Regions:
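N-terminal signal peptide c-region/cleavage motif recognized by signal peptidases
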Residues: 15-17
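Cleavable N-terminal signal peptides
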Residues: 9, 19-20
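N-terminal secretory signal peptides that target proteins for export/translocation
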Residues: 1-2
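Sec-dependent N-terminal signal peptides
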Residues: 5-13
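Short hydrophobic alpha-helices and adjacent helix-cap/hinge residues
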Residues: 20-368
């Protein structure tokens, strides 16, 4: 059942230079649709950041929050209809002035709609990738489905997308890293799990790898393989393969895997070079990678919301890519004998041995 509740956004005075009215208006309701229950930590953190910033800026519109309660990828056939039901409810009563989608599944369900309310109502998104896949028809076998990757910046001109904060995954920069460290690499093994996020990331990687016909792409796909099967495949990968880790939370058994399973995958082939496109495996398995700088985007979305609905100019922020950066595990680099390789400028280094002063900065000097 769809989880729904109302939040009345009360205006509070925080030292603004002009007097503010402590009131709530129902004119132009803001509708926020989340992929998961709002009590889920990632959703809750972003909603809290949104509410705090919106109130701080002086926003006073009624905010309605709906949850799609999405679970496993196997139920993806249901998401489009769930989204349609939510939108139809508001289309019959009072259409919102803005729709905000939080989460990959909610966003995919929204851009899979053909209704007027979906295409005409101003929309924003957060906690999503710049690259996505449109949900399939009911007859499609999701295990075998090979969708095309869509780009939010190019492929949805018929939707009224006024803003959003999106993660951009960069295959090119990670391939360049692999070649810098392993110039004899001939194959790339990409790991993705049995989630919508894993599937959309796999579709994007397949699209990008067409630029590199000289490299063979191997898919370690959680939709078709269990954790043990993926582990066994990793065990037998040859020395001309580099691994690119995408996502790894759920395998084909639809059971959530424990966080320490990536340690098991590492130990299945300890000399296998591994890179990460989404920070999974950093700190114990991956050598490094170019990844988005993940953070709560609720504050930024609130700012864009206020500027669009309540600002003097009604400005559109547009879709904003969340910055990315290079991250490397110094300890892993040393274990693989890669200390002497020049790293990209500005790279973040983790597991770095602290210097003498840093180790003993809290010690009290003794004067003899």
């Amino acid at each position: 059942m769809i989880y729904r509740f109302l939040l009345l956004v009360m205006l509070i005075t925080v030292g603004f230079p002009r007097p503010l009215k402590a009131e709530v208006t129902t004119d132009g309701t803001i509708l926020i649709i989340t992929s998961y229950n709002p009590e889920t930590r990632s959703i809750s953190d972003n909603l809290s950041a949104f509410m705090d910033e919106y109130k701080l800026r002086g926003g006073k519109r009624l905010i309605t929050i709906e949850s799609m309660n999405c679970k496993n990828l196997s139920e993806a056939h249901l998401w489009k209809e769930r989204m349609a039901s939510i939108l139809e409810k508001y289309e019959r009563t009072a259409a919102p002035s803005l729709i905000i989608l939080l989460g990959q599944e909610a966003w995919a369900s929204f851009i899979s709609q053909n209704s007027e309310i979906a295409k005409k109502t101003p929309a924003m998104c957060g906690m999503v990738s710049a690259n996505t896949v449109v949900l399939p028809e009911d007859s499609v076998d999701l295990v075998k489905w090979s969708p095309d990757s869509k780009d939010i910046f190019k492929d949805f001109p018929d939707y009224n997308i006024v803003s959003g904060y999106v993660y951009q995954y960069n295959v090119d920069k990670n391939i360049e890293l692999m070649r810098r460290f392993y110039p004899n690499m001939k194959k790339v093994a990409f790991i993705s799990d049995n989630t919508y996020g894993g599937l959309s990331m796999q579709a994007f990687v397949k699209k990008e790898m067409k630029k590199y016909p000289e490299l063979e792409l191997m898919l370690l796909d959680g939709r078709t393989s269990s954790f043990l099967e993926v582990s066994e495949r990793i065990r037998h990968l040859s020395n001309d393969v580099c691994v690119l880790v995408g996502t790894w939370r759920i395998d084909c058994t639809e059971n959530y895997v424990m966080g320490n399973t990536t340690y098991v995958l590492r130990d299945a082939n300890p000399t296998l070079p591994v890179f990460t496109i989404a920070s999974v495996g950093l700190g114990h398995w991956a050598l490094g990678g170019y990844t988005p700088v993940y953070h709560k985007v609720g504050k930024e979305i609130a700012g864009a919301t206020y500027n669009f609905l309540d600002g003097e100019t009604g400005s559109e922020t547009g879709v904003v890519p969340v910055p990315g950066n290079y991250v490397f595990d110094v300890k892993r680099m040393h274990q693989f004998g890669l200390d002497s390789i020049n790293l990209p400028k500005g790279a973040e280094l983790i597991n770095k041995t602290p210097g003498f002063y840093e180790q003993y900065k809290h010690c009290c000097p003794i004067k003899i």
